[in-house]
Amino acid sequence: MKVSCRAYVEITDPEDLLTLDFDSLPQPVFVMGGGSNLLFTKDFPGTVLHMGNQGIRFLDSASGSARNDKNTVVSTKADGSASVISTKAEGRVEKSVRVEAGVVFDDFCAWAAEQGLWGPENLSLIPGEVGASAVQNIGAYGVEAKDIIDTVHAFDRITRTFVDIPGADCGYGYRASLFKTDWKGRYIITAVTFRLSAVPRPRLDYGGVRKALEARFLDFASGSARNDKNTVISTKADGSASVISTKADGSASVISTKVEDRVEKSVTPQMIRETVIGIRREKLPDPEEIGSAGSFFCNPVIERDHFEKIVAIAKAENGPEYEVPHYDVGERVKVPAAWMIDQCGFKGMKLGGAQVYPKQPLVIVNATGEATPDEIIALEQRVIGTIRDKYGIELHPEVEHV
């Protein structure tokens, strides 16, 4: 959308924040990451500040303590860089990686997967930058940024000092943090230290990731078998498959049993990343072609008795065997906002240049490239009002309105 600001400041060296005269800038000053989760409702009267600092590195500041810790190894590479590998009591091997705020988050995901490190692979292809990921607590496919954030590094505009804030102190919740509430406007995030694992920690039981991986493994096995006249693929009624190899002497051996066993034992961060990217590209618009802010609404978490009322409505409309998609969150229930929006007939609906995306109704897109902020907001409010009237649920936008 065509919106403007009075002034724009690009910071590539965080040290420049110490000498920046904030009071001389057009007010207010708004810190923006990649802008992928923002809806500017009109021209911005103040200054947009963007942290453009780049870099990903293993932390080596723990070298001193590492030498005194028999459970820690410091590995120095030929180029002089160092990584600290700390083996905890439970046997996990972790690496601390500092990523500068201006790094595109998916570039960080790609880097981690290339290194064979576990943690951000399920978050692949989420648009935006690393600094903003710590504000929004981005999440997808069963993983949230808070799960891997160790420390948030920031500039405190009040004290004019650089601070290191433990992730545990950031008040993280579902798409929430203190950076969005009590600390809003105070801190400018300059970098984030992530805690990644060098040993397998796959999270597959969300959003079809496991099913897609199993299909991928079965396709690979089938392809190999088709090129080997001595190999047979046996698929059972329960969906499990065996790859049976017949040797020249006539004996047979089972190479693999259930596909899900192969997935658990052989999956890599890169495989999960590629699978997640494939799923996202199937249902989400390409930002190079259609403008959007990604998921527009948060998925509501409601009381169980309220959920039962929604189930009753759904069964009345779709039949007694119909099952409402949901996820248990302790004693409460998370209901996909996309499902409710679809059930209310909004999928593909247009209002001016704004549209509820046909493939994923959780997304509102600038379908024509000429949508105005007013059209986006009008469509948003129509969705919210209809969901409220039908299900008694107040949807809240995930997108920040500026």
Where are these regions (language model features)?
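Phosphate/pyrophosphate- and phosphate-bearing ligand-binding catalytic cores of soluble enzymes
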Residues: 38, 163-219, 236, 247, ...
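Residue-level signal for inorganic ion chemistry
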Residues: 13, 35, 128, 160, ...
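Anion-binding (especially nucleotide phosphate/pyrophosphate-binding) glycine-rich loop
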Residues: 1-159
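Generic detector of N-terminal low-structure segments
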Residues: 60, 219-222
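Beta-rich strand-turn-strand
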Residues: 117, 373-376
